[in-house]
């Protein structure tokens, strides 16, 4: 199925594709929302979702984008979920930590989706497009959680995404998040990495920096057309 066909079939979703809000004009009716997940492995169908964060993107009166609102949840593994010891060692997540205060997948996804739908309405956009560093990984886990809970109101496009690994490779010659941020002049603390919240906020800064740099170079000017 092509993206255009999907859009035609789902035109009623979101905040109204006909709006001329500058954000809707800039991204063809889509609202970029940065997402990062920390998981119990690489398989979205079998491995646990342990953390998820999302950052909505705003736009100022001059057409420059910026990170707006952050949503973050530690997530209880779904029943029967696989969790690889190597994944916990890599992320540093301690499932039995008394301050972890995890919530169910349903609570996390519903709260994030509620915030995304609010941002869609505010920006006159019809649907969110996931932005991620190696975005297919994050989108796969979002889609798997949606399928597990049979959620009917997923604001995200099911297969389109913006990948900051690709964008950073083009803009800065770097595809690793930490190195791409450093090349972009964004502070990055490796001790904070592999927290969904930290990685999402840094990915949002990187995405906005690339989009704004492109605009400054003349690549996007008349966002009212």
Swiss-Prot record:
Binding positions (Mg(2+) 1): 36
Function as written in the Swiss-Prot or TrEMBL entry: Trims short 3' overhangs of a variety of RNA species, leaving a one or two nucleotide 3' overhang. Responsible for the end-turnover of tRNA: specifically removes the terminal AMP residue from uncharged tRNA (tRNA-C-C-A). Also appears to be involved in tRNA biosynthesis.
Active-site residue numbers: 194
Name under which the protein is recorded: Ribonuclease T
Cofactor note: Binds two Mg(2+) per subunit. The active form of the enzyme binds two Mg(2+) ions in its active site. The first Mg(2+) forms only one salt bridge with the protein.
Family, as annotated: Belongs to the RNase T family.
Renumbered residue ranges of the record's region Disordered: 1-21
UniProt-annotated binding residues for Mg(2+) 2: 36, 38, 194, 199
Lineage: Bacteria, Pseudomonadati, Pseudomonadota, Gammaproteobacteria, Pseudomonadales
Organism: Pseudomonas syringae pv. syringae (strain B728a)
Molecular function (Gene Ontology), one example: 3'-5' exonuclease activity
């Amino acid at each position: 199925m092509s993206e255009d066909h999907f859009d035609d079939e789902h035109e009623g979703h979101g905040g109204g594709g006909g709006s001329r809000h500058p954000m809707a004009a800039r991204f063809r009716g889509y609202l970029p929302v940065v997402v990062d997940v920390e998981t119990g492995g690489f398989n979205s169908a079998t491995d646990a979702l342990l953390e998820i964060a999302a950052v909505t993107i705003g736009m100022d009166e001059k057409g420059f984008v910026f990170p707006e609102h952050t949503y973050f949840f530690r997530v209880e593994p779904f029943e029967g979920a696989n969790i690889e010891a190597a994944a916990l060692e890599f992320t540093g997540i301690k499932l039995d930590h008394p301050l972890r205060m995890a919530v169910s997948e349903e609570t996390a996804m519903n709260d994030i989706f509620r915030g995304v739908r609010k941002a869609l309405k505010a920006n006159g956009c019809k649907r969110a497009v996931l932005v991620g560093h190696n975005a297919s990984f994050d989108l796969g886990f979002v889609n798997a959680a949606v399928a597990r809970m049979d959620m009917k109101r997923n604001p995200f496009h099911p297969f389109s995404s913006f990948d900051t690994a690709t964008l950073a490779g083009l803009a800065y010659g770097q595809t690793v998040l930490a190195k791409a941020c450093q090349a972009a002049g964004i502070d990055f603390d490796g001790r904070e990495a592999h927290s969904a919240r930290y990685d999402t906020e840094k990915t949002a800064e990187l995405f906005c920096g690339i989009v704004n740099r492109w605009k400054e170079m003349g690549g996007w000017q008349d966002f009212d057309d």
